[in-house]
Amino acid sequence: MKGGWHEARAAGSYTLARQWPPRFDVSADARFPAVRRGRLARQIRQDLWRALKGLRGFSPVIQIAAAEDGLTVTAGGRLPTNVPGVETQIRELLQDPAHRARWIAWAKERDA
């Protein structure tokens, strides 16, 4: 646990969750280029939390898996009640060009 967040790294995957074990009651997926998984997950988690912080009981989870052409990100988390439109909000956040550009720039590999 790092700063109240659980991190799990495995071959080809990375998971960041507030509660363990992670659970997706709501989620959306998106594809990303190959970048540093931990940095990408933390940036998405921050903006996901900002977008959904008004949802009582929401606990974010970000899961990133290696794919042939980059990464597959699953963003969402625990939500004790069914709230219409939440998955759409998450999907729109993951597809927002301004957010994506910032996340990718922050998570790109840096030369030493």
Question: What is the meaning of each model-derived region?
Answer:
Residues 1-6, 38, 42-46, 89-102:
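N-proximal, solvent-exposed amphipathic alpha-helical segments enriched in charged/polar residues
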Residues 1-27:
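N-terminal, Lys/Arg- and Ser/Thr-rich interaction peptides
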Residues 12, 56-58, 69-73:
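Residues at beta-strand starts and edge strands
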Residues 13, 29, 63, 74-78:
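Residue-level recognition of well-ordered beta-strand positions that form the cores
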Residues 19-24, 61-72:
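Short, charge-patterned binding micro-sites
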Residues 27-37:
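Short histidine-centered catalytic/ligand-binding loop motif
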Residues 36-61:
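Short, internal acidic amphipathic alpha-helical interface segments
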Residues 67-112:
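Helix-rich interaction surfaces within compact, conserved domain-sized segments
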